């Protein structure tokens, strides 16, 4: 028997598994969950960071440059090399980069030192297996 509210008598019995009460249905918990969701959405919109996403790995990189490229792609070999080559060919320096994958998908946060030329972004977007590109 599993319970999150064991009393003294119940907790003494064999087969009882007491677990912590999470309070997920209390008004306080609902408010905290809403606040957490808003903060996570704001973090994605403002910085491109993914926190507690369902279909992507958590991906958090504090901003280290004035420009940021966000890329979602299929998790396959050589795609990162293709992306970085496009940037290198245009002399766009990568200041910091994070790549995380979960199953069939990967997400990249790339901080760059200079502006990304539109032609570079267009070429990245048109690369096979790239799902999304966003500039912040």
What are these regions (language model features)?
Residues 1-63, 107, 136:
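Rossmann-like dinucleotide-binding domain for NAD(H)/NADP(H)
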Residues 51-136:
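A conserved regulatory-domain signal marking ACT and ACT-like small-molecule sensing domains
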């Amino acid at each position: 028997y599993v319970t999150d509210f064991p009393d003294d008598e119940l907790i003494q019995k064999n087969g009882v598994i007491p677990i912590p009460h999470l309070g997920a249905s209390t008004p306080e918990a609902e408010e905290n969950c809403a606040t957490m969701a808003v903060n996570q959405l704001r973090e994605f919109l403002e910085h491109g960071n993914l926190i507690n996403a369902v279909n992507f790995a958590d991906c958090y990189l504090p901003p280290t440059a004035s420009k940021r490229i966000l890329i979602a792609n299929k998790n396959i070999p050589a795609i990162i090399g293709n992306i970085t080559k496009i940037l290198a060919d245009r002399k766009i320096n990568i200041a910091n980069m994070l790549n995380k994958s979960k199953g069939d998908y990967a997400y990249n946060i790339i901080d760059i030192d200079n502006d990304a030329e539109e032609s570079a972004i267009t070429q990245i977007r048109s690369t096979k297996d790239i799902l999304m590109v966003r500039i912040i």
